[in-house]
């Protein structure tokens, strides 16, 4: 009896222990479920919208697509740069698209279009051979696979050795059909996920376009669309000034990557690379087309929707008058041939800039480079990117600097005579090599007196000329004063034109070479651009106000039609500075320029005496060397009409013969003035008829 009671008591103890453990386990389970319920509630209530957005993003992705750029027009609305539409085949890679799936699509597409295989590299072929023959590639690398497995070599070393083992025999296995597939496949791989990549946009035939369009449902990621190229209705005219746009394959050029990525561009965006296309990129670029792509769980694109059709870029109207531009080019071409026939066989550059002196509008600019045989190539950009010694054209600036620093007075007379310095150095004027002629400042400009400028420079240095004198030893301070005066009219400083790569010329230090200081005063030391010369003479014509030149005129909203859209912005030429001279001093320079072109003793009289409107200006000749042989640069600057200037110009011819024959380079300026004002008169008459 006691034994049974004892056994029963032990059973109860065991049962109680089991019950307690079961209760503990149930408690833990209940606690875990409670935590899970709370966590689930938190996810659904507090974080529900967040995860819904993630799911949504996985399913719907917005992608921007390129649109055509804005047009470039001349000041009268004539289209200079436009867009030419062309058919294109594109590919958009899905988020989870595999290489084998892309290859399958490429194989299907290769049966519908013909690709140019010239861009395929040897490395492309090797990679593709591995893609097509993975087992053969593996069999070539038995030893290396073991080394890769035990860590003896790294993956990049393995890959490098594999590529080195693939030779001509393997690459010869690739058929012409394989190369067609490869040409497509390499373009597919060039793009990023959900970023449309151009497969073919050159010479897409209507047959190809239609065939692909009909098979789109069987070609995942492939689409047919329209691409564009820039077209130039006036051919090569101003082609260099317009600049270039990158191709779809090129995207953002490497040297401009940081510049454009910082502005939110994508790497495969087509962008302006140079000159106007680059300068006005923000204006000419369009508003991208926005597409929404829907993907399934595997990441494949199942549908697309246009969220925003986008718009082509805004139109840019230029200050250029294309009719005047064409005339300047034709006259420059004619003048070059004429000068060569007169003996200028080594002339290698000829350039002209035409502008409105009062508002900075560039009306025309043309440059030509000439080789030994006389063949000419366009070099319009040279008008502001290349610099030359320009000679006596700068003398108006020298006199203004002399007035500013009280070195000379308006109307002051000096004797033009050979200057003899200590050490045997002699300097003289071209028009008066041995005589003694008393002239004033206006006459100095008319005759282009070197001596008057030398004496002005010496007075500026505090050392008036006397025969046998030693030149000043330290001319750093007077050189700075002289250059400051030249800078004020636009010589030796950038003009500020709205184009990249402008040069300010070559401005070398001047400290202990007084001979160079004297040469500076007559345009024989520092070098300047044709555009700087144009700004300089415009400053004289504009009563001392230096205006920033500009080639952009107005910006207009784009429209779906051919006409120019509503005005969005006017581009004005701002006043950069006014020369630090009195009205009387400026008038004196203007009078000297008038005499240079209209007095029978003036250096420009032969060419400019009979222009249809009175013209003022200055000529220049700079001594230079070409391949060690002495040559001269010839320059001409001017403006018209004298009383109310509407046009200013500069002309530069480089490396003409020495001693110079009588060359009629100034005739180009005369012919342009006559054309412009005759045409202006016709336009005014037509306007009167329309009233």
Model-derived features: positions:
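Solvent-exposed, acidic/flexible segments
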Residues: 65-66, 98-103, 201-209, 231-234, ...
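N-terminal leader/targeting segments and the immediately adjacent pre-domain N-terminus
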Residues: 212, 276-289, 293, 301-338, ...
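Solvent-exposed, polar/charged alpha-helical surfaces in well-ordered, non-transmembrane soluble domains
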Residues: 100-111, 210, 214, 239, ...
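Short, small/polar residue-rich loop motifs at catalytic or cofactor-binding pockets
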Residues: 64-68, 288, 345-349
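Beta-lactam-recognizing serine transpeptidase/beta-lactamase-like catalytic domain environment
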Residues: 81-82, 294-309, 320, 324, ...
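Membrane-proximal periplasmic segments of bacterial cell-envelope enzymes
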Residues: 1-282, 291-301, 457, 480-484
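Short, basic/aromatic recognition patches
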Residues: 52-64, 324-344
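Active/ligand-binding-proximal structured segments within catalytic/core domains
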Residues: 391-400
């Amino acid at each position: 009896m006691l034994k049974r009671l004892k056994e029963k008591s032990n059973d109860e103890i065991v049962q109680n222990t089991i019950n307690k453990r079961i209760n503990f386990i149930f408690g833990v389970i209940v606690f875990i479920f409670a935590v899970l319920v709370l966590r689930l509630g938190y996810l659904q209530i507090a974080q529900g919208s967040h995860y819904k957005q993630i799911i949504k993003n996985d399913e719907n992705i917005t992608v921007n697509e390129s649109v055509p750029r804005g047009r470039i027009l001349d000041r009268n609305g004539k289209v200079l740069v436009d867009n030419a539409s062309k058919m294109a085949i594109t590919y958009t890679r899905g988020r989870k698209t595999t290489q084998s799936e892309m290859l399958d699509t490429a194989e299907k597409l290769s049966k519908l279009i013909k690709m140019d295989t010239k861009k395929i590299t040897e490395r492309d072929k090797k990679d593709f051979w591995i893609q097509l023959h993975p087992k053969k590639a593996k069999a070539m690398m038995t030893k290396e696979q073991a080394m890769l497995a035990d860590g003896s070599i790294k993956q990049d070393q393995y890959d490098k050795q594999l590529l080195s083992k693939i030779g001509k025999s393997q690459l010869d296995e690739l058929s012409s059909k394989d190369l067609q597939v490869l040409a497509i496949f390499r373009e597919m791989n060039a793009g990023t996920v959900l970023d449309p990549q151009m497969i073919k946009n050159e010479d897409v035939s209507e047959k190809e376009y239609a065939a692909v369009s009909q098979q789109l449902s069987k070609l995942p990621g492939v689409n047919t669309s329209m691409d564009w190229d820039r077209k130039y209705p006036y051919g090569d005219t101003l082609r260099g000034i317009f600049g270039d746009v990158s191709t779809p394959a090129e995207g953002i050029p490497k040297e401009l990557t940081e510049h454009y990525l910082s502005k939110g561009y994508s790497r495969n965006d087509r962008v302006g690379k140079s000159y106007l296309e680059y300068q006005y990129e923000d204006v000419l670029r369009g508003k991208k087309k926005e597409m929404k792509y829907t993907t399934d769980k595997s990441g494949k694109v199942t549908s697309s929707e246009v969220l925003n059709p986008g718009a082509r870029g805004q139109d840019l109207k230029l200050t250029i008058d294309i009719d005047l531009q064409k005339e300047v080019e034709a006259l420059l071409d004619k003048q070059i041939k004429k000068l060569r026939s007169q003996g200028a066989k080594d002339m290698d550059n000829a350039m002209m800039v035409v502008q409105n002196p009062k508002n900075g509008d560039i009306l025309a600019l043309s440059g030509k480079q000439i080789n030994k045989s006389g063949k000419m190539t366009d070099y319009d950009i040279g008008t502001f990117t290349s610099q030359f010694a320009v000679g006596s054209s700068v003398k108006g600036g020298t006199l203004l600097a002399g007035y500013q620093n009280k070195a000379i007075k308006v109307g002051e007379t000096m004797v033009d005579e050979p200057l003899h310095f200590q050490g045997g150095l002699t300097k003289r004027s071209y028009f008066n090599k041995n005589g003694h002629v008393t002239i004033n400042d206006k006459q100095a400009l008319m005759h282009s007196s070197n001596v008057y400028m030398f004496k002005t420079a010496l007075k500026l240095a505090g050392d008036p000329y006397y025969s046998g004198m030693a030149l000043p030893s330290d001319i750093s301070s007077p050189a700075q004063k002289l250059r400051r005066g030249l800078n004020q009219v636009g010589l030796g400083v950038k003009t500020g034109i709205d184009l990249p790569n402008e040069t300010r010329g070559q401005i070398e230090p001047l400290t202990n070479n007084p001979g160079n200081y004297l040469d500076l005063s007559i345009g024989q030391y520092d070098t300047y651009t044709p555009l700087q010369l144009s700004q300089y003479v415009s400053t004289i014509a504009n009563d001392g106000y230096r205006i920033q030149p500009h080639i952009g005129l107005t910006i207009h909203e784009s429209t779906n039609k051919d006409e120019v859209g509503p005005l969005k912005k006017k581009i004005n030429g701002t006043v950069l500075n006014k020369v630090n001279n009195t009205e009387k001093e400026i008038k004196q320079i203007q009078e000297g320029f008038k005499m240079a072109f209209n007095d029978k003793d003036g250096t420009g009289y032969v060419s400019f005496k009979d222009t249809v409107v009175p013209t003022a200006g200055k000529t220049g000749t700079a001594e230079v060397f070409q391949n060690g042989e002495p040559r001269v640069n010839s320059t001409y600057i001017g403006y018209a009409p004298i009383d109310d200037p509407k046009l200013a110009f500069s002309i530069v011819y480089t490396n003409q013969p020495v001693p110079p024959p009588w060359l009629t380079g100034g005739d180009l300026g005369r012919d342009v003035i006559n054309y412009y004002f005759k045409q202006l008169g016709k336009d005014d008459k037509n306007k009167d008829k329309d009233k």
